[in-house]
């Protein structure tokens, strides 16, 4: 176990969650299942070069090759046809997931302008947390000079928690800076 965040989970967070929620087994304790990064590139409809740039940026941020997402239906108002490439996403699990979460909590989020913590209300009712990033420049891998367009991305942290309370406690103990 090379990752510090994973060691912290096994040695500190998991026992604390078992104690707090009175779980009978360590397998009942919620854990982070996966992290999905999604970048919607609506302007890829008119210029496909924008999508290639988004894919490259997401590849740098995540450390693995993203998959291109396609439109499910045609929407005339957006000049969109079914099957057109309109975004990119990547799913992180295991070692890379812990590396990314560690980097997000300790390096990237503190680089956000006027950062006072992330909202603690963005849980979905099943213990999963969604976070929107307004600009990709907060990640250290992105070279400020090579970016010709500021893009945001969505980060979904999927947990095995049964409810929001368990999910919030898990992420708080892992070090997620929730706003007070």
UniProtKB/Swiss-Prot annotation:
Q: Name one GO biological process term.
A: translation
Q: GO terms for CC?
A: ribonucleoprotein complex; ribosome
Annotated InterPro entries: Ribosomal_uL5 (IPR002132), Ribosomal_uL5_bac-type (IPR020930), Ribosomal_uL5_C (IPR031309), Ribosomal_uL5_CS (IPR020929), Ribosomal_uL5_dom_sf (IPR022803), Ribosomal_uL5_N (IPR031310)
Leader peptide range in chain numbering: none
Report whether Cytoplasm shows up as a keyword of the record.
no
> Keyword annotations for this protein?
Ribonucleoprotein, Ribosomal protein, RNA-binding, rRNA-binding, tRNA-binding
Q: Which GO terms describe its molecular function?
A: rRNA binding; structural constituent of ribosome; tRNA binding
| Domain of life (superkingdom) | Bacteria
- Please tell me whether the keyword Ribosomal protein is annotated for this protein: yes
Spans through the membrane? none
Q: Which family does it belong to?
A: Belongs to the universal ribosomal protein uL5 family.
Q: What is the role of the protein in this entry?
A: This is one of the proteins that bind and probably mediate the attachment of the 5S RNA into the large ribosomal subunit, where it forms part of the central protuberance. In the 70S ribosome it contacts protein S13 of the 30S subunit (bridge B1b), connecting the 2 subunits; this bridge is implicated in subunit movement. Contacts the P site tRNA; the 5S rRNA and some of its associated proteins might help stabilize positioning of ribosome-bound tRNAs.
Please give the subunit comment from the record: Part of the 50S ribosomal subunit; part of the 5S rRNA/L5/L18/L25 subcomplex. Contacts the 5S rRNA and the P site tRNA. Forms a bridge to the 30S subunit in the 70S ribosome.
For this entry, the protein name equals: Large ribosomal subunit protein uL5
Q: Which organism is it from?
A: Leuconostoc mesenteroides subsp. mesenteroides (strain ATCC 8293 / DSM 20343 / BCRC 11652 / CCM 1803 / JCM 6124 / NCDO 523 / NBRC 100496 / NCIMB 8023 / NCTC 12954 / NRRL B-1118 / 37Y)
Organismal lineage: Bacteria, Bacillati, Bacillota, Bacilli, Lactobacillales
């Amino acid at each position: 176990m090379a990752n510090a965040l994973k060691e912290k989970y096994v040695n500190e967070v998991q026992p604390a969650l078992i104690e707090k929620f009175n779980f009978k087994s360590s397998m009942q304790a919620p854990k982070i299942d996966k992290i999905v990064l999604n970048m919607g590139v609506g302007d890829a409809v008119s210029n496909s070069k924008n999508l290639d740039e988004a894919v490259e940026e997401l590849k740098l941020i995540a450390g693995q090759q993203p998959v291109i997402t396609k439109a499910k239906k045609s929407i005339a108002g957006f000049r969109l046809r079914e099957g057109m490439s309109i975004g990119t996403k990547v799913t992180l699990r295991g070692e890379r997931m812990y590396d990314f979460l560690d980097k997000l909590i300790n390096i990237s989020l503190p680089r956000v302008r006027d950062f006072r913590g992330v909202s603690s209300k963005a849980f979905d009712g099943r213990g999963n947390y969604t976070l929107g990033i307004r600009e990709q420049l907060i990640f250290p891998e992105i070279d400020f000079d090579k970016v010709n367009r500021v893009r945001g991305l969505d980060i979904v942290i999927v947990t095995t928690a049964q409810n929001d309370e368990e999910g919030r406690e898990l992420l708080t103990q892992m070090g997620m800076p929730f706003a007070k």
